Amino acid sequence: MNQKHGVFPEPGTIRFERLLPGPPERIWDYLTKSELKATWLSAGDVEPRVGGKVEFRFKHSDLSETDEPIPGKYRHMQDGTYFEGKVTEWDPYTKLSYTWGEATGEVSEVTYELIPQKNEKVLLILTHVHLGEDPTVLISVSAGWHTHLVILIDRLEGISPKGFWAVHNKMEEEYERLIGNK
């Protein structure tokens, strides 16, 4: 389950399911605390309330110890990138949603659902909606989330993650095949 590709339940939507080592409180901290969020996604505060600000300070080179080149089409992100969203749902240890304005310049929305499982495991369901239908955007966003989730799992399991761009490049190729065949 933890390496499966995301699925596209409807146009402009990507959904991932991952089984994570819990408990839910631990996963919630990785979603909402800047110092933990920075280890797998991006630094930035999350104001703990509906309507609260969510900061995204991306610097992909900080997500692993690996020094690797940034692909040419992402070179504009070399020194990092910043944007903000707003919390649209805040149900601690269960569900977090916020707006996301980076992919197309349009506002999309990300939802994380945490479902407790046996043996201190947590099923994470990540859904990103309102992405539009541009295949280039869908490929990039799908590969990005897939890569960030690989890094999250490594962090939760105490493993040093592989370089972001090496994984992302591979995932982009795979999602290009998947989306190109839709």
Kindly give the residue locations of the regions a language model identified.
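Hydrophobic ligand-binding cavity/cleft-lining segments
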Residues: 1-49, 53
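Short beta-edge strand/loop motif at the mouth of beta-sheet-based domains
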Residues: 15, 35-80, 166-170
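Hydrophobic/aromatic beta-strand elements that line small-molecule binding cavities or substrate pockets
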Residues: 18, 44, 82-88, 109-116
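A short, structured loop/turn motif at beta-sheet edges
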Residues: 24-25, 47-50, 88-94, 113-123
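Hydrophobic pocket/interface hotspot
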Residues: 27, 37, 54, 87, ...
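Short beta-strand segments that buttress and anchor functional surface loops
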Residues: 54-56, 71-74, 97-103, 126
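Beta-strand/loop substructures that line and gate deep hydrophobic ligand-binding cavities in soluble
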Residues: 99-152
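A conserved amphipathic terminal alpha-helix motif
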Residues: 129-182
